Amino acid sequence: IGNAVTTPRQEKVVVEESYPERIPSESYYAPSGLRITNIRFIDDNRNHTIDAEENCKLVFDIVNEGDVSAYNITPVIEEVTEMKHLAISPSAQISYLPQGDRVRYTATIAGGKRLKTGEAVFRVYTTESNGAVSEAHEFSLPTAKRYK
């Protein structure tokens, strides 16, 4: 009780702070000067379908349209729909791409023995050592199971 007279009352202070809204799809790094062009799909039997037990190629050009050279470029090819029995070759890193130059990149996509008929959706983009990410391209390709 003796303390009640000498102790000041604690007042609650509410501080409202505002933070910028984060949008998860945006890159928080410098925009990339890289652009993916001329995407082509080539399969062994030329039917424009990924068949079971077939090796296919995905070929595209990476163009440096930025103001500076790009370093440690990693082309990324993702299968978005998580279709099973599809194998994509590991990415090969491109160590240096001068401003205004282009490089042609080839990835292998293999259909496994147990591949099902359906549609696979792929996303292709590049990342750089500074964290910059290029614009992503999405496209779909039909898949077909093996017929006995």
Model-derived features: positions:
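Short, low-complexity, glycine-enriched hydrophobic/amphipathic alpha-helices that associate
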Residues: 1-14
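Low-complexity, acidic Ser/Thr/Pro/Gly-rich terminal tails and inter-domain linkers that flank the onset
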Residues: 14-52, 82, 139-148
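Terminal connector regions
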Residues: 19-23, 87-90, 106, 110-148
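Short, acidic/polar linear motifs in exposed loop/turn regions
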Residues: 45, 63-69, 113, 130
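Short beta-strand elements of extracellular/lumenal beta-sandwich folds
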Residues: 52-67
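Short acidic, flexible loop segments centered on an aromatic residue
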Residues: 63-84
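Short proline/glycine- and polar residue-rich coil/turn motifs
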Residues: 93-103
